[in-house]
């Protein structure tokens, strides 16, 4: 029997956390982990600038987290493989990104992402966090 490894997975139960940790270690000048499954810019912009946040499931890394950095996203909230992050995790990110200029939340048009975003925006509104939501069109990866 061969000992050749065919995958870069240590533990399937921890794949998302390990992928994000590895990504942050590989690009420390661009990103850091602010909390579990929350990727933010290594060098945040000022409170006078709108924070741009997005969310989505893992499984295509670096996927959305690959867009976190100067001139792009400020924060990416990552769910489990092919699953949206929960509303509480997104709300945690919105609290981290709260600033005077507000937050633009870019939501991919997948049912779980939309549901989590709607719930997190309601929680944010109750706390006085200014969030504007932008719903994008679906990509065609799910098939027609």
Residue ranges of each PLM-predicted region?
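Gly-rich Lys/Arg/Thr-decorated short loops/hinges at beta-loop-alpha junctions or inter-strand turns
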Residues: 1-4, 46-55, 64-77, 142
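N-terminal amphipathic/basic leader segments beginning at the initiator methionine
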Residues: 1-52
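Solvent-exposed alpha-helices and their adjacent loops that cap or buttress functional pockets
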Residues: 31-32, 43-47, 53, 65, ...
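Gly/Ser/Thr-rich loops at beta-strand to alpha-helix junctions
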Residues: 57-62, 79, 108-117
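Glycine-rich oxoanion-binding loops at beta->alpha junctions
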Residues: 60, 64-100, 138
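A glycine- and small-aliphatic-rich helix-loop capping segment at beta-alpha/alpha-beta transitions
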Residues: 67-75, 120-130
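Active-site histidine-anchored catalytic micro-motif
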Residues: 98-100, 112-116, 128-144
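A short, small-residue-rich loop immediately preceding and capping a beta-strand
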Residues: 101-109
């Amino acid at each position: 029997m061969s000992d050749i490894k065919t995958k870069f997975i240590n533990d399937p139960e921890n794949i998302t956390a390990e992928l994000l940790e590895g990504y942050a270690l590989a690009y420390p000048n661009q990103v850091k982990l602010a909390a579990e499954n929350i990727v933010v810019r290594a060098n945040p912009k000022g409170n006078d600038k709108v924070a741009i946040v997005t969310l989505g499931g893992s499984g295509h890394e670096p996927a959305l987290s690959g867009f976190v950095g100067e001139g792009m996203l400020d924060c990416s909230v990552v769910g489990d493989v092919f699953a949206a992050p929960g509303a509480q995790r997104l709300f945690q990110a919105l609290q981290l990104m709260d600033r005077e200029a507000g937050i633009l939340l870019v939501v991919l048009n997948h049912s779980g992402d939309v549901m989590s975003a709607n719930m997190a925006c309601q929680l944010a509104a109750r706390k006085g966090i200014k969030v504007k939501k932008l719903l994008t069109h679906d990509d065609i990866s799910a098939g027609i």
